[in-house]
Amino acid sequence: MSQKKKASLSKIHTGMNSSSKQVLSSTSSANEKTEDDVGDEMDFSLQCDACKKLIIGLNNLDRFDCGHFYCLVCSPLQPKENHSSCATSTSPSNAFTREVSPQQIAEHTGELSNNGAERGKIRGSTRATRKGSVNKSKSGRTRRHKKVPDQRLWYFLYLSKPVVVSLPTDATYHDLMARLYTLLGVSGKTHMITLRTQKSSSEEGEGEFSGRGDPAPLEVGDSKTRLSDLKITRHKMLLLDVDDQKKDGSGEEKKEKKSAEKEKKISHENVQSLSPSSRAEDPRSS
C-alpha cells in the first residue's frame, strides 16, 4: 500500500472519531437535566392553596417558608407577612406536627392490645454501649458498666386516664406504691392508694353465668411480695384510686370519748348491783 493511500485512510478514521465524539457529547448534554426539568417531566401536580386548582410541574408553583404552595398567578397576591404566624411557619420539617390539647385526649377504655406491643419488656441488658461512653481509669483499663436490670411496664387507669410505671422485674409491692405516691404527688400520711383488678374481655365471657361483679381489690399478703407473684391480669389495666385518710379526732374529742366509756361502765355496774340475782348473792340483803 502506497503512502498516499495510508494518509487518506488515517484522515477518514480521524474524521469518523471526531463525528462520533460530537454525537456522544450532544446526547450526554441532552441527558443532563436539572431538578426542575425532572420535576416538570414527572408531572408533579399540586393544589394551589388559594384557587384550589391542580398545577402540573414544580416550576409553576411558588412555595412559601410556611409550607403553603401557590400558583404563579396567586403567589403575587399573597403577602408573605400574613404567613409568618402560620401553624407550620417554624420549619418545613415541622409542617405536619401539631400540639394535642388535653381536651382532645379521649378517655382510655383500659383494654390493652393482645399483640404484646404495649406489654413488652424493656431489655436493658441488651442495649449496645457506645465506645465513646466507656470511661477509662488512670491505668488505661476500661471500666465495666453494671448490668442494667430488665424493666417491666405496669399500666393503671386513674380518672379514666392511663398511667404507666416502669419498674425492675424483681420489684416488690412496696416499690410500686412508693413510685405511685411519687408520681401522683401525694403523701402516704394524708392519702391512701388502693388498687383494684378488673376482668379481661375473655374472662368476662367465661364468667357470664356466674356474674361479672365489680372490680375487686388487689390481694396483697405482704408489702415485700414481688409483683410477679401477684395475680394481676396483663390484658386489663389496674384501677387506681386515691382517697383521703380518715384523721383521728382532736385531744378533746378523745377525752370526751374516754369519759363516755367510763360513764357507760359505771352505769352498767350499777344496773348489775340492782338486779335480783346480785341481791340474792349479797349477804346484807338477808
Curated annotation (Swiss-Prot):
Domain of life per record: Eukaryota
Low complexity bias spans: 18-29
Bias kind Basic and acidic residues: ranges: 243-268
Biased composition (Polar residues): 269-278
Region (Disordered): 1-38, 108-146, 196-227, 241-286
Listed name of the protein: Uncharacterized protein F10E9.2
Organism: Caenorhabditis elegans
